């Protein structure tokens, strides 16, 4: 069966479908029938709208959700900026270093001393969240549960790629459990709390500052394939009912700065909701992989799970691409990804296993690489020599492995933390990968 066999059981119930109009109520009758904001909402609830696009966005792009909650989201004290030394998402665009070097990182460390909010580290990015342009690439590593707290990003949509450990995510709209080999998208503004039911966690995030993630167009593939809409899971309504005053802290990532505010009630008090703006998760094991059944290696765009499109058709601010287990059957073909210089930037990570274009040992689970715009890259020496001389029988590759890529049309700058502070950059990446490549050319015009 094309699903991942998880060792940690998911206790939650979900609604299925990508970009579907869902509705859910934790108490029967909490959803108004036939209208959105009645004079008095059922059970004394407040009606509140959560907008993910402008009101007048085209219908096929419009993202809105109506929620019915015990107290409005506005009921909190003023926000105060946190001490900059306490978090790691801050990036002045001028301080990002844009360099043409190919970069590769050793596995990033687990950190059992911090929670989700304080375990976010900006590695690279481009653009400006204040004008809703660009993206940010973050690593997360945490070992503590969030307490009576909630967090949201006003900057963009978080696409979370779990690499190690289990995330129990309590959102305003319901609960999701996210395990390695699953991804989760939490839209801009949705408040949530992360607890860790199976110990420390680590993974990757691509924050999309503009627009929202979509399924890629399938074109000649047809009506099914790649990530199918029915396999995405959205939460059902669930709420905490705390009648007495209880202090909560609300964190906001706002222009990559961290702010906090106090409130005297739970943020997780939405009893019912309906709309198409909500968090969701997806099991990467359900991806229906396509490939060549004749010759040549296709473009990696055929492995796209989700895309964050730019204003130029066919060009993405962020594509999320995976390299799952698959059969290679192409005849008379160099089967690994080819050598490449790309007008797009490519940030890669490894959830588990290995990657067929990097067999030399330096690309490891929980590590990463960045090949920026027009920075040459491709198979290392070991991969080239092996694939050039391999017996071209049908071969299954990637069993137990899952590599991924955040690809962007933007030139990506690297943060001080990503380049130096983390101390994970492999200084000899080029020396180990491509400098050992041998000259095989023999000019037929010259006497042998």
UniProtKB/Swiss-Prot annotation:
- MF GO annotations: homogentisate 1,2-dioxygenase activity; metal ion binding
Q: Which residues bind Fe cation?
A: 340, 346, 377
Q: What is its EC number?
A: 1.13.11.5
What induces its synthesis?
A: During growth with phenylacetate and phenylalanine.
Instruction: State the reactions this protein catalyses.
Output: homogentisate + O2 = 4-maleylacetoacetate + H(+)
Report keywords, A-Z. Answer: Dioxygenase, Iron, Metal-binding, Oxidoreductase, Phenylalanine catabolism, Tyrosine catabolism
Q: Which Pfam families match?
A: HgmA_C, HgmA_N
The protein in question is named: Homogentisate 1,2-dioxygenase
Protein species of origin: Emericella nidulans (strain FGSC A4 / ATCC 38163 / CBS 112.46 / NRRL 194 / M139)
């Amino acid at each position: 069966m094309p699903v991942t066999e998880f060792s940690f059981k998911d206790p939650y119930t979900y609604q299925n479908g990508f970009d579907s109009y869902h509705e859910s109520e934790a108490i029967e009758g909490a959803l108004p029938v036939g209208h959105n904001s009645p004079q008095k909402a059922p059970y004394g609830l407040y009606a509140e709208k959560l907008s993910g696009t402008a009101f007048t966005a085209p219908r096929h792009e419009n993202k809105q959700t109506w929620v019915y909650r015990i107290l409005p989201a506005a009921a909190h004290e003023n926000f105060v900026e946190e001490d900059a030394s306490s978090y790691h998402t801050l990036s002045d665009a001028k301080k990002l270093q844009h360099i043409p070097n190919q970069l590769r990182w050793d596995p990033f460390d687990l950190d059992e001393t911090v929670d989700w909010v304080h375990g976010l580290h900006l590695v690279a990015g481009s653009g400006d969240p204040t004008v809703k342009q660009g993206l940010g690439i973050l690593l997360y590593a945490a070992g503590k549960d969030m307490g009576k707290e909630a967090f949201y990003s006003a900057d963009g949509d978080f696409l979370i790629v779990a690499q190690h450990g289990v995330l129990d995510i309590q959102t305003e709209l319901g609960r999701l459990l996210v395990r390695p080999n699953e991804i989760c998208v939490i839209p801009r503004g949705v408040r949530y709390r992360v607890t860790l039911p199976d110990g420390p966690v680590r993974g990757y995030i691509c924050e999309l500052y503009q627009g929202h993630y979509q399924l890629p167009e399938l074109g000649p593939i047809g009506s099914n394939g790649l990530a199918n809409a029915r396999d995405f899971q959205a939460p059902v309504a669930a709420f905490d009912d705390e009648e007495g005053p209880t202090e909560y802290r609300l964190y906001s990532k706002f222009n990559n700065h961290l702010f906090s505010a106090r409130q005297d009630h739970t943020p997780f008090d939405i009893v019912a909701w309906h709309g198409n703006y909500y968090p969701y998760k997806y099991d990467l094991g359900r991806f229906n992989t396509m490939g060549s059944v004749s010759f040549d290696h296709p473009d990696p765009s055929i492995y796209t799970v989700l895309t964050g499109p730019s204003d130029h058709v066919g060009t993405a601010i962020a594509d999320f691409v995976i390299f799952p287990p698959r059969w290679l059957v192409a005849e008379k073909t160099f089967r690994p990804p080819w050598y490449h210089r790309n007008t797009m930037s490519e940030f890669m990570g490894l959830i588990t296993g290995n990657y067929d274009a990097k067999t030399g040992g330096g690309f490891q689970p929980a590590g990463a690489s960045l090949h920026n715009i027009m920075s040459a890259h491709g198979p290392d020496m070991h991969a080239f020599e092996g694939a050039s001389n391999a017996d071209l029988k049908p071969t299954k590759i990637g069993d137990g492995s899952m590599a991924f890529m955040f690809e962007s049309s933007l030139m990506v700058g690297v943060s001080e933390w990503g380049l130096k502070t983390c101390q994970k950059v492999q200084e000899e990446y080029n020396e180990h990968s491509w400098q050992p490549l041998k000259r095989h050319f023999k000019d037929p015009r010259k006497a042998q």
